[in-house]
Design a protein with these regions (language model features):
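N-terminal Rossmann NAD(P)H-binding glycine-rich loop of SDR-like oxidoreductase domains
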Residues: 11, 15-20
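Conserved mid-core segment of classical short-chain dehydrogenase/reductases
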Residues: 60, 81-98, 141
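Catalytic Tyr-X3-Lys loop
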Residues: 90-109, 128, 152
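Active-site helix of classical SDR
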Residues: 112, 148
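Alpha-helical segment proximal to the catalytic Tyr-Lys
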Residues: 117, 160-162
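Residue(s) in the substrate-gating loop at a strand-loop-helix junction
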Residues: 132
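Conserved Rossmann-fold SDR core element
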Residues: 153, 163-178, 215-223
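C-terminal helical subdomain
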Residues: 172, 191-231
């Protein structure tokens, strides 16, 4: 049985680091989905340009390349989503909630829906969504973002229950602050950068989940920060 990997958002700040790790693992074929082509190359890599995946027709188009097969187990990791924050509820524009539900929840819903249809006709598979720490532990000034990410967790946990019937496992990672250039600028000089989780480390977590996709399902993997252990 072959194992094929799909990465959505492969060329973003998180996705690029994760992809660099995963392309070195033993997947028979890897599909990289992003709005911009990734520079990573390999004989087993196929790059697929995507549009706005909150649009159902764009999701259908993205998955049109992937063909179901009883000889293939499919794994999908998505980094797609958006962020807004910094305002109390009474100062928050309703459009901010709409945007977060579109970019975080609706996109995840549609990816899960159409990926499940492929897995249903294949040997099995696993999907791993990117949620957020604040989707579990509320923080001030992040209601639209937190609500949307909390909903992604509910989506994954319910899909894990339903997925038993089609040999599909579903999980989420919930990182706190990821070590990206944008987050470093936002945190400023007072931040302990050694505590920030590196995209490449998340890549290893993703691979571990997919290595054990038959037994790990319905799980939220909380990533609160790195332990500051000297190498």
């Amino acid at each position: 049985m072959e194992k094929h990997l799909l990465i959505f958002g492969s060329n973003g700040a998180l996705g690029n680091g994760v992809t660099e790790v995963l392309v070195k693992k033993d997947y028979n074929r890897i599909y990289l989905f992003d709005a911009k082509p990734n520079e990573i190359k390999g004989n087993n890599i196929e790059k697929i340009l995507i549009g706005n995946l909150a649009d159902e027709s764009e999701v259908i188009k993205a998955f049109s390349t992937i063909k179901p097969s009883k000889e293939i187990a499919y794994c999908l990791f998505t980094t797609l989503g958006g962020y807004t924050g910094g305002k109390k509820l009474w100062d928050t524009d309703t459009n901010d909630l709409t945007k977060m539900l579109e970019s975080n929840l609706k996109t995840s819903f549609l990816l899960g829906k159409y990926f499940a249809r492929i897995v249903k006709e294949s040997a099995g598979g696993s999907i791993l969504f990117t949620a957020a720490y604040t989707g579990i532990f509320p923080e001030k000034g992040k209601i639209p973002y937190g609500v949307s990410k909390s909903s992604v967790i509910y989506l994954a946990e319910t899909l894990a229950l339903e997925g038993v019937d089609i040999n599909l496992s579903a999980n989420t990672i919930a990182p706190y602050i990821i070590d990206t250039p944008a987050n470093r600028e936002w945190m400023g000089n007072d931040c302990d950068y050694e505590r920030l989780i590196k995209p490449e480390e998340i890549g290893e977590v993703v691979h571990s989940v997919f290595l054990n996709f038959r037994i790990i399902s319905g799980t939220v993997i909380k990533l609160p920060g790195r332990l500051n252990i000297r190498q």
